C-alpha cells in the first residue's frame, strides 16, 4: 500500500545554491515560532521581566557618564554626555545580546536538531530576531531622553532603518561563525563574553570617533559597529559630521561577515546533528 508521507532528501550543494534561501523562506513560520519562544524563555520567572531591556543599557550609561563624562571629561561632540552614550548603547546592546544568543543557539537547540529536519540557519536567525523587543523598549527610552534634552530629530532620521539593518547583519554574520564553531569547540562560549567586552571598548560608545583623523576613522570603520554607532548619533542627535565613508566601509565589512558566515555555517551544517 503506497505511503502518503513526505520524504525529504538532503543533498550537498555548492555556491549560492547551498544557502537555500527559498527553503529558508518556506520555514518562516518556524522562524517566528522560535523567535517568540526565545523571547518568552528569556524573561520567564524574572521579577523585573522586560524591564531588564532598559536597565542594562541605562545603568551602563550612568557608569560611563560618571567615569568618562565627569571624571575623564571625554568629549561628546557637543552633546550632553548621558544621551551621547545612551544613543550608542541602545544599538550596541541589541548587537551584543544578539551575538551572545546566536553563538549558543545551536547547542541550546540540540534536541530539536537531532530529531527534526529544518534549515539550521533558522536557529541563529531567530536568536537575533528575538532581541528586537528589547531594542524597541530601549529605543523608546532614548526618544524620551531626546525630549528631555530638547533634541529634535532632523531629516537624517530617515537613514535610521539602514543602521538597524547593519546591526542585524553584523550580529547575524558573527553569530553564524560563532554558533558553528561552538558546536565543534565548546570553548567558544567562554570566549564570547571577552570578545563582546573588547568589542565594546573598540567601538566609539564611551568616546567619539572624531578623536581620530579622517584617514584613521575610515580604517577604524573596519569595525562594523563604528558605522552603526556614529550613524545612530548622526541620524538621531544631529552630530555635525556625516559619516559617509565610515558607513560605506562598515556596511561592506558587515555584509562580508554575513556572506562568509552563512557559507561557513552551511559547510559545517552536515555535521551538526552528529556533534551537537
Predicted regions and their residues:
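Hydrophobic transmembrane alpha-helices and immediately adjacent juxtamembrane helices
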Residues: 1-276
Amino acid at each position: 500500500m503506497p505511503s502518503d508521507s513526505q520524504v525529504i532528501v538532503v543533498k550537498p550543494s555548492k555556491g549560492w545554491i547551498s544557502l537555500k534561501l527559498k527553503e529558508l523562506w518556506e520555514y518562516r513560520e518556524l522562524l517566528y515560532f522560535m523567535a517568540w519562544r526565545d523571547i518568552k524563555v528569556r524573561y520567564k520567572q524574572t521579577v523585573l521581566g522586560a524591564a531588564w531591556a532598559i536597565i542594562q543599557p541605562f545603568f551602563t550609561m550612568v557608569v560611563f557618564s560618571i567615569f568618562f563624562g565627569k571624571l575623564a571629561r571625554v568629549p561628546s561632540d557637543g552633546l550632553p554626555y548621558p544621551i551621547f552614550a545612551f544613543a550608542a548603547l541602545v544599538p550596541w546592546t541589541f548587537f551584543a545580546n544578539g551575538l551572545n544568543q546566536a553563538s549558543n543557539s545551536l547547542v541550546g537547540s540540540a534536541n530539536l536538531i537531532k530529531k527534526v529536519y529544518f534549515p539550521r540557519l533558522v536557529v541563529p536567525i531567530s536568536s537575533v530576531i528575538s532581541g528586537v523587543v528589547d531594542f524597541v523598549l530601549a529605543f523608546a527610552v532614548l526618544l524620551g531622553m531626546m525630549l528631555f534634552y530638547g533634541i529634535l530629530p532632523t531629516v537624517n532620521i530617515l537613514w535610521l532603518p539602514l543602521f538597524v539593518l547593519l546591526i542585524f547583519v553584523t550580529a547575524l554574520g558573527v553569530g553564524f561563525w560563532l554558533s558553528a564553531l561552538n558546536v565543534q569547540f565548546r570553548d567558544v562560549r567562554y570566549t564570547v563574553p571577552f570578545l563582546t567586552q573588547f568589542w565594546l571598548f573598540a567601538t566609539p560608545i564611551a568616546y567619539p570617533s572624531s578623536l581620530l583623523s579622517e584617514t584613521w576613522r575610515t580604517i577604524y570603520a573596519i569595525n562594523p559597529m563604528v558605522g552603526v554607532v556614529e550613524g545612530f548619533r548622526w541620524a538621531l542627535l544631529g552630530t555635525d559630521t556625516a559619516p559617509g565613508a565610515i558607513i560605506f566601509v562598515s556596511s561592506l565589512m558587515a555584509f562580508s561577515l554575513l556572506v562568509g558566515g552563512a557559507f561557513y555555517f552551511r559547510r559545517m551544517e552536515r555535521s551538526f546533528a552528529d556533534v551537537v
